[in-house]
Each structure stands twice: as C-alpha cells, then as structure tokens.
Amino acid sequence: EVHRCIRDPGVESKVAIPIDEIKSPSTEFITGRVTNVDVDEQVVELEDDAIEYDYVLLGIGSGTAFFGIDGLEAHAHELKSLDDARAIHAGIEEAAENASRDDPAQVIVGGAGLSGIQTAGEIAEYRDEHNAPLDVTIVEGLDEVFPGNDPELQGALRRRLEALDVEIITGKFISEADEDAVYLGGGEDDPGEELAYDVLIWTGGITGHEEVHGVGVEQDDRSHRINAEADFQTSDERVFAVGDAALVDQGEDAVAPPTAQAAWQAAEVAGENLARAVEGRPLKTWHHDNKGTVVSVGDDAVAHGVKLPGVGTLPINVFGGPAARTLKK
C-alpha cells in the first residue's frame, strides 16, 4: 500500500504499523541494517553490531532490479519504502510547480506490473485532485500491461488507466536513461526512440538485496533471491527464507509469487516451522492458496478470480467498482 503515499504522504499512518502493536511482550526488537549473514559462524552481522543465532529466518524483502540498463539506477526513483514514496511525491509536486498547461511536466513510469500500474494511478489522481499540469506515461517492454495474467484482467486494467488519461506504451523496452530522457529500443548504431521526462519512476522488477549476495546458501544466479523449499528451509538447515527475498518452491518448476498475499500466508507456516526446528519436530510444507488479485488504479480497483471464505470463487471473473474497492481495503 506504500504507493498511496505518492499522492498523499499524510496516509503514512494507515500504511506503517508500529512494531510494538504486533510483537509479543517476550520478543526483543532490534533496529539495525543487516550487512551479512555468516552461516559458518551462525552470526547476523549489522552495521554496528552482530547477533548470534541457532536458527535464522531471512525475510528482508527485495531490491529493485535495474537489469544493467545504462543510466536507469542513477536517474530513476524506485518504490520500495515510504521514503521512496515521499521522494516521488516531492518530485511530481516540484515538476508541476515548474510546468504549465502549455508545457506540462512529463512523468514516466517504467514497468506495467502491479507496482507500476498502482503508481501511475496514484500520480494521475494527484494530477486531477490538484489540477496539476502533468502528463503520465507508463512504459512496458512486453505486449500488454500486467504481463502474464488473464487477458480479461489486463483489458480491465488498461481501460482503467486510459480512463485516468494515462498514456500506455507496450512492446518497447527502455534501453537507456539519462538525466533528461529515456530511450526505447535502439541498437548499436541506433539510440532508439527518445522520451523526455521530468520525473522517472522504475518499477520493472525485483532482485535480492546486496546484503544477501554473499550468504552461503543456494541462490538464483541472476536475481540472488534465496532458494527455499516449501517448508522455507534453505540449503543450510539452520537458515530459512520467506517473502520476496526467497524463491519458495511450489512444485512443477513453480515458485510462490512475490506478493503481500503470499507473504502473509507463508509467514504463519514459516514462524511455526522455526519453532518446530528448535524442538526437533517435522516441518510443515506450505502451498500458496491464491485468493485472487485486487489491483488499485487510483480511486478505483479491479478484482480478478476472488475467493471468499465459505463462498469459494466468485462467479464473476473480473470486476471493479465498489465491490473491488472494498476488497482492496
């Protein structure tokens, strides 16, 4: 939900949850940044401390994947935290102040997955609420928004973005970025199509944090996300991994999706398995139960394949309006 803070940082209190409200009284909470996990010495290394462990669960999330695209990391905002959302808000606010109706500021969102769609929607709503001179464009290298999903859902999301006056460019990859523009396509002697921007946001993929690159457990060679079995155990029996820091095996060459819904489900079993490991009991396996997808696009939302307790899968495959907005909340 951090994307909502792009439009209005004042909603932070509805997005951030104080640790004291969720931890048990017996849980010690330490604030610090993990720099490494030494699996041989069984130590979690922090910037200014070190914590010994018997078992450790790695749930540190993911970073933004820039895929080696020249200039992209240096010039684009990312959206992984409240600080990122604040920075995007400040960027579009400043760009709008320096623009005019005749010469609107250009905002480009790279990537039309979940984060990209929701980001573009929030910026479009900001534009409309503040009557701001902003043009919003979303760029996706594959052929449709929300790649790899049901075409009916893709169509509904496209229509909602278009209703918000978001320009959609698909089938063209960003190949380069500098301080003024992104370049689409191109080659060795072809710089590609130039798109000027005032604010650039990149949401085009995830990767494992640098801090886990050197951890001595099996990882995906490209993304450095940690390989974990369906019980969350890694190649080191004392190291578990969960959430989008991990590639959790789901059988038939599938892994759990890097979504909040999956992480929420997984956390219960992962936590129980830590206790089981300590007690020497067999570990439970977990399989993601997809309860459907709800994507917010500005003030509206689009739902797909929703399953409700006691009801099962709803007979309507894709829907929006008040019902979808209620589910999103």
Placement of each model-derived feature along the sequence:
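Residues at the starts of beta-strands that form the adenosine-phosphate
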Residues: 106, 133-136, 238
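A Rossmann-like FAD-binding core segment of flavoenzymes
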Residues: 29-32, 36, 128-225
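Glycine-rich Rossmann-fold phosphate-binding loop(s) that bind the pyrophosphate
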Residues: 110-113, 142
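FAD-binding core/adjacent interface of flavoenzyme oxidoreductases
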Residues: 27-105, 110, 201
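N-terminal Rossmann-like dinucleotide/flavin-binding domain of flavoprotein oxidoreductases
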Residues: 1-55, 66-68, 150-167
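C-terminal, flexible cofactor-proximal segment of oxidoreductases
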Residues: 266-329
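N-terminal Rossmann-fold NAD(P) dinucleotide-binding loop
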Residues: 116
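FAD-site-proximal beta/loop scaffold in flavoenzymes
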Residues: 74-103, 181, 194-265, 272, ...
